[in-house]
Amino acid sequence: MTADTPRGRQAAMPFILVTVLIDMMSIGLIIPVLPALVGTFTGSTTDQTFWFGVVSFTFGIANFFGSPVLGALSDRFGRRPVLLLGFCGLAFSFFATALAPALWVLVAVRLVSGALQANAAVAQSYVADISTPQERARRFGLLGATFGVGFILGPVTGGLLGDIDLHLPFYVAGGLALLNTLYGVFVLPESLPASKRRPFEWRRANPVHSLRELRALRGVGPLVTVMALGSLAQFTLHSTWVLYTGLKFGWGPRENGWSLFAVGLMSALVQGGLMRQLLKRNTPQKLVRLGLISSALSYLCWGLAPEGWMMYAVIGLNLLGFTVTASLQSMVSNAADATSQGRTMGSVASLNSLMAVLAPLTGAGLLTLVSHRPQGDFWIGLPFYFCALLQAVAAVIAFRHFRQRSATSAASSAA
């Protein structure tokens, strides 16, 4: 079953969206409760913050080395088998996490899970396979919206289940991952025809080499830096949100589940519906510029918020920020040839994984420095102030890059 005809490509899009939805629901389920689960093995808030950073770091470093390998394998053998491997890996990791008897077991499980988890990168390659260059920004937006819907349903469900038992969300997430495996086996078509596959090379699966190749793509070098800064800010948010809101507002799994529900809802609304309208009136470059400014202001306001309800208000302020990732992905994908989409998106995933490695060190590290301060203290927002700075620097780089590209294009036209 393949998606290498126009009708097949059109029909394949709903299949991959359903796959991503179930995948992200399962991941989203554990977000509100994983820090609390780590806390059951530690004796203080400071230790909990530190070890949650270690658990997140372990997943990220394994994913950094695993993503380009799995991306290159998907260029060789097709997207479908690599996605199925990722679903099986997720199911194993969720069940093993729920049953972990000690902290070192939890760390080991996250290491294996990170090495096998490249579903996001392969899904992006899948969408690139079945889309024309003109369709990619909109379809990456739909993919981002599906991620958002998964994070609507996942965290709020995980928060409610976590109130019953901390381990219950992990069992439910494992069940969803198994369901996704069955869906992939019986329903999901292959998107990469045999004629467009390429041999596997270990050299190209090296994450450092992958990042160099990504920077070498014509016209996207500075955008890689923008993506890196944006990813570091986003993953710092992910790695500190639950701990931060607990320290500042005294929130538990239920409150964090609802707040992450709101983030996912806004992401889905913007990328699933509003982005199509925005692209009719704006270029992806303009959306990147406006989105980075919006994100910088939002991170600053999240860090400054003196009351919990304000966290919800700031989500609305970040409306344009939800368009940045899809816009950047479409520009990078359009710069790569058809036989290299898996490797290119694997390289993007490696970049994201590297930032996911650094985020717990920076976010949890900064939060550890201020965790002794009283609830509601100004300095508890330090990780978010850091994220605002990252987005501001990314905005400056993007503005300069697009201005230079415009000047170069104008000079070429005049010649």
Regions found by a protein language model. Name each.
Residues 285-328:
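C-terminal transmembrane helical hairpin of 12-TM major facilitator-type secondary transporters
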Residues 78, 99-104, 116, 250, ...:
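Helix-breaking motifs and short loop linkers at transmembrane-helix boundaries and internal kinks
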Residues 66-78, 270-284:
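Helix-to-loop junctions at the C-terminal end of transmembrane segments
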Residues 32-49, 239-256:
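Short amphipathic helix-loop junctions that connect adjacent transmembrane helices
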Residues 64-103:
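Conserved MFS/SLC helix-loop-helix module at the cytosolic interface between two early adjacent transmembrane helices
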